[in-house]
Amino acid sequence: MTLKVNRRSAIIGLSATLATPAIAQVQLPAANQAAAARRNASSFVTQDWRDHFKTLGKGVIVADTFSRALHYWNADGSDYRVYPTSVPMTDELTKRGYTEIVRKKVGPTWTPTKAMRERDPALPDFMEAGAGNPLGSHAMYLSWPAYLIHGTHDTRKIGRRSSSGCIGLYNEKIAELFAITPIGTQVRVL
């Protein structure tokens, strides 16, 4: 018997071969599908405020340094937002745990810490608000001294390990978050 292969047969055979991985992927057990869904299309890990806080209080923020995202929920939980962030350059610069927003400032000034100046002696002693200021357009100060959630004029930093300990957002995103976040908002840094 002779096997005759025409173009249609070859295309059908190739299509079936290429589709097999997709079919196998759809047939994952439910437990594996749920685990795979924990990351969204932007690769941020999905967070639930209940995993971190007993109540929403005035609102809550989860700053996830691993997936480089900030999650915000308002006081009644009806407003949930997620923002891409910059995170500390090293784990040694990262403070993790619970804190809260204690002060907010539009057009923050910047004074490098002693540790920053030791790492880079060329840093200025003080910097007024403006385009060269690394704190960007808005800053929300945490109860931990020298730790902030702030903007940045250098958009290349977002999504990267680039800060000296703070959580940075695009200026337009920190302005949005600043407007809806009251002093007293609970914060957890992971």
Residue ranges and their predicted role:
Residues 1-17:
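N-terminal secretory signal peptides and thylakoid transit peptides that target proteins
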Residues 27-115, 128-131, 138:
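Cell wall/extracellular polymer interaction/catalysis modules
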Residues 22-24:
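Sec/Tat signal peptide C-region and signal peptidase I cleavage site
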Residues 56, 90-98, 109-190:
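Exported/periplasmic cell-wall-interacting domains
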Residues 1-2, 61, 165:
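Short N-terminal micro-motifs specific to bacterial/archaeal maturation
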Residues 3, 16, 67, 105, ...:
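Short, flexible active-site-adjacent loop segments at beta-strand->alpha-helix junctions, enriched
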